[in-house]
Structure formats: C-alpha cells, structure tokens
Design a protein with these regions (language model features):
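Formylglycine-dependent sulfatase
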Residues: 4, 8-9, 18-259
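Repetitive helical segments and hydrophobic/amphipathic motifs
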Residues: 11-13
Length: 259
C-alpha cells in the first residue's frame, strides 16, 4: 500500500495527526488518518517507554510510531473501562458528560458530536473496524465492521449493518486484513480517509495466535520487587490482594486448572 498516513496508537494518536493536518493545510492536501487502538495495553509492554520488559519483548513497530510522531509521558486515561474509554475518545468528553459511564449501560448516545462526524463534515470518508463495545450501532462512519460484544480471539463474530457472521481465523489478523482491504478497495480514493482500527488484543483472557505459543518459551521476564510481597503489617493491602485474586481470574490467566 502507498498511503500517506498519520498514525496513532491507543493513547499516542492525536498529536501526530494534528501535526500532519497542519502540514496538509500548508500543502493544500489533507492527510489520511489511521487511529490504531489496542485494548488494556500496559505502558510497560511498549519498549519505547524503557521498561525492562521491553528488552525481553521489544515492540519496534510501536516504537517507530512514537519516534516519528510524539510519545506521551505525562498523561492520563479519563476512564479505564473498555466501553467508557472508547466513548471518551470518540467525543472528547468525560464519561459523566457523554453519558456512557460503565459497560453494559443502555448504549452509547450516537446522536452527539464525535470525531468521525466532524471529519465527515470536513470531507473525510470514515470507517471503524474491530472492537466497538458500545452496545448501540456506530454513527458517523461510512463503513463499519465491529466485533460482537468483547469479541473472541479465535473465529470471532463480526457485525455489519445487516449481518452477523463468524469469521474463521485469529482476530488480530482478521481486523488488520479487513482494514487493509478497505483502504485498498473499499473506499472512495478521491477523498481523504479516517480509519479507526480497534484491536481486541491484548484484553484478557489472553489467547495468543497458535504460531506464537512458544515465542517466549525461553525468555525470562523480570519480576517486580514486590512480586513476593507478604504484606506484613499491612492487613488492608493483603485483603485487597485477595480480592484481586478472586475477582480478576489470575488462575485462568495463568492457565491453571482446578483439581
């Protein structure tokens, strides 16, 4: 593909896009914009931030996006829950203002102003492909193809305007493939485009692609200093740890089978 792109990843997207738009105004040409979102992606897992994990599992393509654009070092997420976080990104408003404050709410109010709607008004063709998780159907998009609810890692269901079908394959590969197909053949190439590529990964419960099962078989990941914390003299912290173990499915994440 030979696309002029302004790339963004999760919480790194808008500064490069704005810079590209400034250049576009100077040239009289509007840039294409791709917003790439991963799910529950820890900062420490991106090697551009310099965490020791990055030496074991480097992320060179993510790093390149930051090196060619901007990296945020002092920022926050206004809502860390899946659906509400997406609603905040779409609207630029906190959850109590956009009305979507928790998952499994009544549904996102798609009648309000959003980024894709503004770009449509500016002559952009818009699309969202991948995880949506806002219950109501997407608005402000010329094309949308979204996962059913959280989506599945293997053979996921995709929803389009009139159909829900199972697609054979691994979800990250499929979302990437469908985004490429839309950019190559599914859009009006006389218009600039705005594409939201919303990946399910790396949301728990983790299921890697089969080809990656042994990718880190011999790697040794550094443990944090408090990994074996006994919580001596800190009863409240100990109880909170027990709640995390019970409520956050650590056993399932570690592929532990109950006897």
């Amino acid at each position: 593909m030979d696309h002029k792109l302004s790339l963004g990843l999760a919480m790194l997207p808008l500064v490069p896009a704005v810079q590209a738009q400034e250049q576009g105004r100077q040239d009289g040409e509007r840039p294409n914009i791709i917003f790439i979102m991963s799910d529950d992606h820890a900062q420490q897992a991106m090697s551009i931030y310099g965490h020791p994990i990055g030496k074991v599992a480097p992320t060179p393509n993510i790093d390149r996006i930051g090196q060619e654009g901007a990296v945020f070092w002092n920022n926050y997420c206004c809502n860390s829950i899946s659906g509400p976080s997406r609603a905040a990104i779409l609207t630029g408003k906190h959850s109590h203002k956009n009305g979507f404050m928790k998952n499994w709410a009544l549904g996102f109010d798609g009648s309000q102003q959003t980024l894709p709607k503004l770009l449509q008004q500016g002559g952009y063709e818009t699309a969202v492909i991948g995880k949506w998780h806002l219950i109501s159907k997407p608005t402000g998009f010329d094309h949308w193809m979204i996962l059913n609810d959280q989506g599945e890692y293997c053979n996921p269901q995709f929803i389009t305007e009139g159909d829900t079908t199972i697609h054979k394959g691994y979800v990250t590969d499929l979302i990437t493939q469908y985004c490429e197909e839309w950019m190559d053949n599914g859009r009006d190439k006389n218009k600039p485009f705005f594409l939201m590529m919303h990946h399910k990964a790396i949301h728990r419960n983790w299921v890697p692609a089969e080809r990656h099962y042994r990718l880190y078989e011999h790697a040794k990941f550094p443990l944090p200093d408090n990994y074996y914390d006994a919580y001596e003299g800190r009863y409240a912290a100990q109880m909170q740890k027990m709640n995390i173990y019970r409520d956050m499915y650590e056993g399932h994440d570690l592929k532990m089978v109950a006897g």
